[in-house]
Amino acid sequence: RLQWDLYNIPHHCSYLSLSDVKGERETEPKPLVKELLLHGKPDAYLVSSSNPIPDLKESYSQEQPPHIQARKAYKRYLKEVSGREFLVTMEEPNANKPEPLIFEITDGGVSWKRSTSIGAPSIVTSRPPRAG
């Protein structure tokens, strides 16, 4: 079976990549999409190439992606597989000054090199534990 460490969320975090129905608070994925989401490995990352996805009252009626209902679904399934992080490209390191996401892929897994814009430039590495 296919398992993933890094999943690029399709269509800018639109509910239509999960289901035909947005859902009031959270999108319920179709069975095969749910199966794919449940094949995430522990410490996996989900990445939404999209604008920020705020959890505000008006976000729930938004027609164009990104959709907060889809974000909630992705985050729920990431938690179910003990995933590490849900990232939105235009929110990192902050929504005012987003920067590219950089991942390192090694035989030990995938790690996100977190960029911080506080004080002097620095890199904080988030590495999954290596088994064995």
Please report, for each region that a protein language model flagged, where it lies by residue.
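Metal-dependent phosphodiesterase/nuclease catalytic metal-binding core
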Residues: 1-42
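C-terminal regulatory/interaction regions
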Residues: 23-24, 34, 39-45, 49-132
